[in-house]
């Protein structure tokens, strides 16, 4: 069944919980205490400018977005696009790009190189030159690259057949799959690498943690197994199908197609539409800001969580008109008058540029300009 699901996803896209867990009623109290200040902050408001093929994008289906100083990179269905000085430059297979469909992007802050995960290999853009890595010419585990993350001299890659790591100093590749890690399935949808920990988002196999110092792998599962009903809400990872992961300030933010999770190394706190401000449990991507704040990209809009309150930004699901709503800790939802919204409700990528936000959607790229 999972293989059938995976095939569908490719077409559309081009064990126990670790550590002791307290009762659900207490599991998120430390998180609430840390987030007390967030309750007094106004939720961000934006004026959205949208980019489509009408104003320079090579394709309206945008899988990923990356902020690189004043440059904005967009991975689309039909090439890699970079926006600089109010103009777009497009890279495609004729320029050396591995494949026209660019699923993921990462920046090497040391060198300025941009890494692009595609449907047929991994490409590096460096000073206008593109080098491509595939199963045939490198140690890449699979040519379908869902995620990429750079940590110092290491490039971590999430693929349809496990994960791998390229050491840029030695040129050596290391492969990680069901043979040398606890993953039950090998479809790795996302990776978040830092000097201390690396996290893998695995389709059907939960969340994997790699300790950079000890070389040890740990695995975090949904205590409900593959049951779509949530029996133990804050007892562990919300679901086995993990689509995205973000590790920031020693906090893990995980996205699944059945809700979201936050983990501080001891306590879990899960997010479901029935008891929070998420517009949908179907989460494509997640981007942590810090220990308390995160952005969620769902199939029904862009959502922001400040540790207590929620905001949702989207075209209305019924009228298509720009819409923003705010939800407080008591569950009160308040509409906010706005005149702009992200290009589409189906959000696939998120990145930040100062106080602004860039959003990759199924129908265009959006720039949210923070308003006072």
Residue locations for each model-derived region?
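Sec-dependent N-terminal signal peptides
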Residues: 4-13
